[in-house]
Amino acid sequence: MKFDKINNKGQAQLFENKFLEALTKGSPQLSWGIHLPILIFCFYYGYKNYQMPLGTMFMVFFGAIFFWTFFEYIAHRYIFHLISENPKLQRFAYIMHGNHHHYPRDRQRLFMPPVPSLIIVAALFGIFYLVMREYAFAFYPGFVLGWLMYASMHYMIHAMAPPFKFMKPLWRNHHLHHYKDETLGFGVSNTFWDKVFGTMFDLKKEKEDKETVSYTHLRAHETL
């Protein structure tokens, strides 16, 4: 689809039910406050109860952070930008990510809301534990910390100017994704995988159009 104009002010209404609508909003403080203590406890529990070497745990932990960057790219490209003729999938795509492209500066929807995020990370821990057993207690904290850092970077990109000059390419890459071509520039916390998979913008040549944006999600944002 193509939005005739994106809205740099305002907020999409996803549900008519006020309770459900409230569950679609979050903040950096809520996300860090909820998840960071869980990550610390999880890592400590794994260390104390499984007696894994601390060096091994940190290798798994930092490996998980790197794996998050790959997951971030794949999820953004193939799940958040899902294209389908199915109305339910269209609706899912708009709730998950399409509303953010429609209202990119809505700060209340730059972080995943607390309730959905807790459900998702609990399911992820279960999957990690089934696959890697005790190593999940190091992998899970690294993976979720990667998500928190990504979400914080995403929030900063939409809420403020880059604090350091070397970070400007990240800002430009994501702004081009929103305001120029949403089929490129899927990396948010980094551009490594965009370079690997050939979806990197030429930052020296491209200029974003802040009034219109090509967006291939099918329109399905009517409220329930």
Regions found by a protein language model. Name each.
Residues 54-74, 84, 139-149:
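Membrane-embedded alpha-helical segments that form the functional core of polytopic membrane enzymes
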Residues 1-36:
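Cytosolic-side membrane-entry/anchor segment at the start of a transmembrane helix
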Residues 2-12, 55-68, 85-92:
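Hydrophobic alpha-helical transmembrane segments
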Residues 77-212:
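Membrane-embedded catalytic scaffold of the fatty acid hydroxylase/desaturase
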Residues 216-224:
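Conserved small/polar residues in nucleotide/adenosyl-binding loops
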Residues 23-61, 119-129:
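Long, highly hydrophobic alpha-helical transmembrane signal-anchor segments
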